[in-house]
């Protein structure tokens, strides 16, 4: 419920929202593995069956002097929300076969084929049934160039699972100016081909590992926001399939024990990644990044073990590359950025193996900010009506366990 202050000691209710959803899932999986050719090959085959059910209902009441109030909605006037009551059910069958082949001590190949057959039915204010089927192959080739260098190539078709909440109307928890987020009963699964090259180098004297990865993703039926407005006076966006896109990037990781400076129990981990993406915006017709897509991330951490004192402690620093990380909707564009995230821990183990751990999260004055640009008539019209800047400051939190 939402209330407006109408005076120093009075208030008036102007909104009632009641949202209830229940998700149930049942999964059965069985497989059998068979060795071939004296252990140089093996085959695993099996099947998985999954049932997922979402029951969802939403009631909306507003202050409307010309309407008929309902006690069930807190004394406010009911509003008809499309697709407010619905049951969505998926039955999915997935037979699979996985083949492992060790050519020699330096080369191996894992290949697999999964077939997904699913039926999604929706009952309630909207009744609809749709069937999907996908063949999902994968190849994973590994080659030990030397005893310390391994190369790996992967090609895989990845099909993303649908979120049932996108089919039905629900509360809009991200936008206080909009009460309801519409559902879309016409969603299809998004999927992509993933191509990866990996290289791993084991450092001398067993002090650690360094690795690098490059990837390319070729997307089909990407899910982002689309226009599902009932009328020009009631602009509404929902998740929907916007077309094809691509995503690519690179990543470098390292994990090193500082034995070279006489601290073999000090482990330092570092990583850096960069990525970009491209898709055609359904509202503006421009090429842009995927919504919420990262530009990159850097992490640095260390862990120091002191076995003689039964103590270990460490610190982790994480930072994302902000700037131009946007979310596009029908009537607004959001830009997100945040400060680096720092955590620390201290752990002690007693002689009777009781462990005490102290953690400190979000060291410093961590801040997350969101800028929202809201446009009159939609972002395609280009008439900026409102600029909102929302920042959250979170202090340091401590825990002892």
Feature-to-residue mapping (PLM):
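Face-selective signature of the C-terminal outer-membrane beta-barrel domain
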Residues: 1-124, 144, 212, 249-256, ...
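Hydrophobic, lipid-facing positions within transmembrane beta-strands of outer-membrane proteins
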Residues: 24-30, 91-97, 135-141, 183-185, ...
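Repeated loop/turn-to-beta-strand initiation elements of outer-membrane beta-barrel proteins
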Residues: 40-43, 106-109, 148-151, 205-210, ...
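Transmembrane beta-strands of outer-membrane beta-barrel pores
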Residues: 49-55, 115-121, 155-161, 170, ...
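Membrane-embedded beta-barrel scaffold of Gram-negative outer-membrane proteins
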Residues: 51-55, 144, 148-156, 160, ...
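C-terminal beta-signal and adjacent terminal beta-strands/loops
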Residues: 159, 321-326, 346-401
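Gram-negative outer-membrane beta-barrel transporters
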Residues: 209, 214-220, 236-324
């Amino acid at each position: 419920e939402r209330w407006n202050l109408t005076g120093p000691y009075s208030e008036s209710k102007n909104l009632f929202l009641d949202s209830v959803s229940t998700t149930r899932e049942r999964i059965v999986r069985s497989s059998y593995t068979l060795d071939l050719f004296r252990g140089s090959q093996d085959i695993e085959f099996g099947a998985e069956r999954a049932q997922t059910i979402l029951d969802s209902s939403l009631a909306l009441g507003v202050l409307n002097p010309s309407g008929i109030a309902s006690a069930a909605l807190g004394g406010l006037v009911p509003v008809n929300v499309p697709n407010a009551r619905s049951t969505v059910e998926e039955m999915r069958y997935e037979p699979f076969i996985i083949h492992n082949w060790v050519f020699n001590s330096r080369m191996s190949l894992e290949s697999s084929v999964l077939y997904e057959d699913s039926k999604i039915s929706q009952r309630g204010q909207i009744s609809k049934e749709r069937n999907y089927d996908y063949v999902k192959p994968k190849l994973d080739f590994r080659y030990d160039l030397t005893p310390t260098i391994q190369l790996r190539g992967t090609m895989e078709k990845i099909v993303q699972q649908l979120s049932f909440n996108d089919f039905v109307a629900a509360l809009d928890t991200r936008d206080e100016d909009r009460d309801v987020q519409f559902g879309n009963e016409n969603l299809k699964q998004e999927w992509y081909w993933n191509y990866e090259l990996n290289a791993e180098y084991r450092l001398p004297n067993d002090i650690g590992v360094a690795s690098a990865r490059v990837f390319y993703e070729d997307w089909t039926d990407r899910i982002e926001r689309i226009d599902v407005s009932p009328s020009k006076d009631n602009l509404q966006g929902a998740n929907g399939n916007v077309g094809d896109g691509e995503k690519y990037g690179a990543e470098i990781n390292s994990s090193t024990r500082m034995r070279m400076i006489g601290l073999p129990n000090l482990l330092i981990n570092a990583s850096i990644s960069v990525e970009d993406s491209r898709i055609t915006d359904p509202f503006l017709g421009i090429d842009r990044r995927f919504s919420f897509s990262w530009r990159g991330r850097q992490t640095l951490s260390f862990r120091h073990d002191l076995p003689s004192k039964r103590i270990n402690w460490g610190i982790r620093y994480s930072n994302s590359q902000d700037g131009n990380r946007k979310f596009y909707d029908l009537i607004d564009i959001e830009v997100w950025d945040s400060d680096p995230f720092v955590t620390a821990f201290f752990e002690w183990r007693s002689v009777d193996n009781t462990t005490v751990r102290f953690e400190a999260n979000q060291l410093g004055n961590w801040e997350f900010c969101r800028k929202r640009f809201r446009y009159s008539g939609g972002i395609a019209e280009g008439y900026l009506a409102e600029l909102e800047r929302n920042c959250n400051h979170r202090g340091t939190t401590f825990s002892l366990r």
